[in-house]
Amino acid sequence: MSEIKFSDFQVIPILDSVKKLDMSDEMYFSNKFAQYISNSRLKNINPNEGGSPQLYKNPPRLQTTSLAIGSAVHECLLQPEEFELAPKMNKPTAKLGAVVDEVFKLRKKGYSIYNAIHTACEKIGYYVNSIDKKIPSIIEKGFEYYWKRHKFESTKDTIFLSDSDYDVVKSCLDSCNANKQITSKLHPVDNLFGDPIDSYNEDALFIDFLVTYKKKHCVTLKFKMKADNWTIDHDAKVITLNDLKTTGKPVGWFMAPEYGSMVKYHYNRQMAAYSSILWYYCQQQFGVCKNTG
């Protein structure tokens, strides 16, 4: 077998393929865009993280408390005109709370109480082998929250959390909104007149890359990203990409070389991929280039 060298590969962005779409997280992670590579999905093929081709093709859909808290902070901080936190409603914690949420949705679709609970438990993975025995307990522990949610009205997309998770998210939001360094990054103004600089939130960007081996077409790779926030200052010719991270550990640990989240979750790889994709989009959309700005 001949030796394969990385230098024989060439990765070329297809600028005509770059597109920006407005979509929900649910759509972004749906099967419709499953052929696109994302930074988070790459871990499923990394053998050092237990990845494999099979796992990459059929990635698990994880839903944890940490992810729910992170999503709530992202949505309420970056899109306050669209999202809001519901007040405390004594929502059950962990999977039971998710079951009640799913039951609520299914009941609005016309499911009977029995079928809604069964379907919700199967979807969430909550006592799937003994659902009938758990139904009285589910109703007893979840009814107060279910009824309060039923009576709640809002014109925004509402995020319902357990009381303890609500406290965490509220604290994060209050801290971020009170931090001038953070708010100035998310909502920048120009230094001369104080006018707002173009700022965008939760943009989904897509691009194709042509990969050649020894100058022959090898494969076309499709990449996607969801930009938390990015700004473009047309006068100063500066593009800024901001990515919001939430952590339950001391902030000083984030960049630690061995155990920090930056290394553990490959955020350096994400930073490289996201900044490149955003740059190609701006190059195609605004005609910018690195030499002239």
Model regions: which residues?
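Metal-dependent nuclease catalytic cores that hydrolyze phosphodiester bonds in DNA/RNA
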Residues: S2-K224
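Mg2+/Mn2+-dependent nuclease catalytic core
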Residues: E202-G293
